[in-house]
């Protein structure tokens, strides 16, 4: 469903000048169309997930809608402090899109596993976790 999520993201960017994408050296292929259509609104901070989250928080504070994209494990665990302090506690509106759930990237080792994301996010009650199973689920979630 990565392709469908990228298409929905592109549609959001077409409909709103406020949407920005921040990635941490991931999304190649699936986000190429987004990057090509809106290079001035697409930011790749390199392999630096903490920076990605910090940039997104800063953008949100300036009134834009930041969307962070990364592998689920990298998106949640590496910038955890920023997510806890700003997105959860201060409720700064940052959208997070994670690729891969549970053991989808099993062959890459434990650093890529997101098998305990529900337990970790239970400590952050102001961050909603969605795990769409179908494209219809994804479309419904996207409307929120």
What kind of feature is each model-predicted range?
Residues 1-144:
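Thiamine diphosphate
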